[in-house]
Design a protein with these regions (language model features):
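Polytopic transmembrane helical bundles with strong interfacial aromatic enrichment
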Residues: 1-140
Length: 140
């Protein structure tokens, strides 16, 4: 078995939730800007599914990261900074997805402004998490 398998798995899985959370924020934010109902509904529906798929994608990313680090929850140096962003980001994204999935109305309804702000915070956190993960790979 490839000794770097879990590092490769982590690298392969982390990009989906990063992209989908950023995309969800962009879509729902854009949904607030459009006055045409059909356009708004399409954007909010895509934002809904992007968030749910992004949250689902966090699970293999977190599991592969934990296996790769042999269960180290914080670590030292850059790994510690990465994990200090990763754990709250993971919890926030899963919580936001549950909030959206259990919310009233259909998938294409306008989410609350509070929800969109929370997704914006998650987008910033997932970006910071990815940045510090990249710093470990680049080795700076």
């Amino acid at each position: 078995m490839d000794k770097d398998l879990w590092a490769k798995m982590h690298g392969a899985t982390v990009h989906f939730p990063i992209a989908l959370v950023l995309f969800s924020f962009t879509l729902d934010g854009a949904g607030y800007a459009f006055s045409k109902l059909a356009m708004r509904r399409g954007l909010h529906s895509a934002g809904y599914w992007s968030m749910l798929l992004g949250a689902a994608g966090t699970v293999p990313a977190v599991v592969s990261g934990l296996v790769m680090t042999k269960g180290v929850l914080l670590g030292h140096d850059t790994l510690r900074v990465h994990h200090l962003f990763a754990w709250p980001t993971f919890a926030l994204i899963v919580g936001i997805a549950i909030w959206r999935a259990l919310g009233r109305g259909s998938t294409n309804e306008r989410p609350s402004l509070g929800y969109v702000v929370a997704v914006g915070i998650a987008a910033v956190l997932v970006s910071a998490t990815g940045y510090w993960g990249g710093e470990m790979v680049v080795g700076r």
